[in-house]
């Protein structure tokens, strides 16, 4: 249990969770990797001095710089995108670069194969509870002007303890030939909205409708359009208990299974696809 710095009063809440008075309902705001030093952001990190660094004193704090070559591919956007590329057979993503461990637990060398299960301990959005929940994707309505969408989800407490759950809605945007030509960066999945339920007694349900701003699906084109763009193609919404679960649900709706390298079979009924014609 990670508690940060709760203070003296906050420890009452910690005790309530530990002794079962209340069920935990928090979720991770980042991915927990087995070795974050192998992520692109850390591999690109360095102390690169300016050629005229000697003209400045160290206290000026301007004698070196960083190149953020990883772009948007930090945190879960890196791990989930690389995983999806492996399942979809894109770009040799299974190569050993950035690999932490082989399946047998040994540290990988040149012949290692990148495996999501060996790299990620807890995905983004992961959380624990003393009870269990089941969610259904009831309805998705895309506004005629393509500016907003409504996603309706029902959450049911299927366990024996009262508790809260979060409705997490993720999105996937099409990765087009145009995107490849102009090096536009897109994550295989991105959190698009979320909301927590009220405390649900065992057997109780709650239906939540999330209002989604579709402008958040845009990507920045720095090489050609010099602005944010929305590509024509197939878009996906998915509900999941975390980023990886939601991505697996999207991949399942695309016909992928563990036979294609998925860590687990997804639930296609928790995914919704729709077309954007531009």
Predicted regions and their residues:
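Conserved aromatic beta-strand anchor motif in extracellular beta-sandwich/beta-rich domains
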Residues: 169-173
